[in-house]
């Protein structure tokens, strides 16, 4: 494990009322993710992140952490202290865990679903529907998935390789079709 990530995790105070989680728009259980990381349960931490947010790898790079989880961190209230930089922790866990993801599609429920658009909302619902057993097809006007993530966010901020990897690990391996 990268030492700088563990050092960052060790800075977490383990608050009883985690303001970081309240500051997260999708209420990621940040204290539990950090606890699992510190307990060397990387797969459990990664699974928790991806179950809560299929786009966790993307969010670790582009989310406005400074005004959300990190901006709400109680360490900000202490003189000359920086918040726990969860963006570093989330990026490390989600990237490491994503590189191991190989599981195939969930058992089918016999129902089909069409998703129009492969932007953040379309990709998220497609992954969730596939988890619930739907046979999912995404319809998009562009050749590559991602919508605003690919065509609106600069490559230096969100590399195309992250979205290409998402397509392989979360769509192709799960049997989600893209047209």
Task: List each model region and its residues.
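Ferredoxin-type iron-sulfur electron-transfer modules and their immediate structural context
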Residues: 1-112
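Beta1-alpha1 glycine-rich phosphate/pyrophosphate-binding loop at the start
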Residues: 27-39, 49-50, 72, 77-87, ...
